[in-house]
Amino acid sequence: MEDFVRQCFNPMIVELAEKAMKEYGEDLKIETNKFAAICTHLEVCFMYSDFHFINEQGESIIVELDDPNALLKHRFEIIEGRDRTMAWTVVNSICNTTGAEKPKFLPDLYDYKENRFIEIGVTRREVHIYYLEKANKIKSEKTHIHIFSFTGEEMATKADYTLDEESRARIKTRLFTIRQEMASRGLWDSFISPKEAKKQLKKDLKSQGQCAGSPTKVSRRTSPALRILEPMWMDSNRTATLRASFLKCPKK
């Protein structure tokens, strides 16, 4: 699984995931499924904001070609991936500027068009189950929830999907591709099943020549969302950088 992640995700996303896991004492050699899940969630958050801007008239527009003369503002502020201190600083700044209610938990994005925070979810289970778990945790009607699955399903607060159909289809296609590539490598079953994950881990450790008695317990603790964001993500050219970074999984 680790090799798959390094092949299928942009190195910058992989690096952010590595730093986050290290910060919380998680070993990516052991928690390989969590490593893959964090990278996937990060990429979906970046893809969610990609191409979306607000023009001088305050209208939401989609721009795929950069025009240096255009006075555009990014529609979405990416909060996911920053360190906690910076993330809360950004959230507080947004709340002070827009009058938005401060969320209890750090959200993933802020939508300047709809003036609301957004929590993004990517699940290997039924979307409605994961949606309810998110809603019960957040306990706030002010934070918009949008859940994607690897099967192409999605669920959002009040069926308001925020993005246009084409943008959402791009995210769904990427998730479906990840699933298909995992399946072709025999990794999908272990990704969705803790029991199968343990079997795969033992197999991987054995193939790496590690002691058969090495600890194989997979943590059930949910990783905090990534809070480490490189300065480049703040740059005005981040959209072009991200667009170029979405790599297709190479075949075996």
Curated annotation (Swiss-Prot):
It is found in: Host cytoplasm; Host nucleus. The record marks 195, 198-199 as: Important for efficient shutoff activity and nuclear localization. The active site is at 80, 108. The keyword Secreted does not apply. One of its GO terms (biological process) is viral RNA genome replication. The probable endonuclease active site in the N-terminus and the basic amino acid cluster in the C-terminus are important for the shutoff activity. The C-terminus acts as a nuclear localization signal. The C-terminus is recruited to host protein complexes involved in nuclear Pol II RNA processing. Plays a major role in the shutoff of the host protein expression by cleaving mRNAs probably via an endonuclease activity. This host shutoff allows the virus to escape from the host antiviral response. Hijacks host RNA splicing machinery to selectively target host RNAs containing introns for destruction. This may explain the preferential degradation of RNAs that have undergone co- or post-transcriptional processing. Belongs to the influenza viruses PA-X family. This is Protein PA-X. The gene is PA.
